[in-house]
Amino acid sequence: MKLISAIIKPFKLDDVREAVAALGVDGMTVSEVKGFGRQKGHTELYRGAEYQVDFLPKVKLDIATSDDNVESIIEAISKAAYTGKIGDGKIFVYDLAHVVRIRTGEMDGEAICKPVKPMVAPS
């Protein structure tokens, strides 16, 4: 089992959600986060005063899935989040030791998203 964490631009969230939903991913956790990388911050003007914004708003999404689904989900996120500009984001993949669905007591593979549909190239 794996946990896929993606940091993306906020305006790309709907595109990414639709892309992974098309694969059959039926759940994810979304958090509003701030950060910077190569993009750094930027300068803004507010009431005539200039100030530096060091941390930029981003969205983090987490998807728990089986090992077999990882590459398809990464590909879907990468395509949907892509703008070609600095700050598109990053995808991290972590090992999951144990998962429990609180409501039912289901564990591990039964408690995470079902197998995804293979990605088919549009014709």
Protein language model regions, located:
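Positively charged, small/polar-rich N-terminal and surface patches that mediate targeting and assembly
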Residues: 1-123
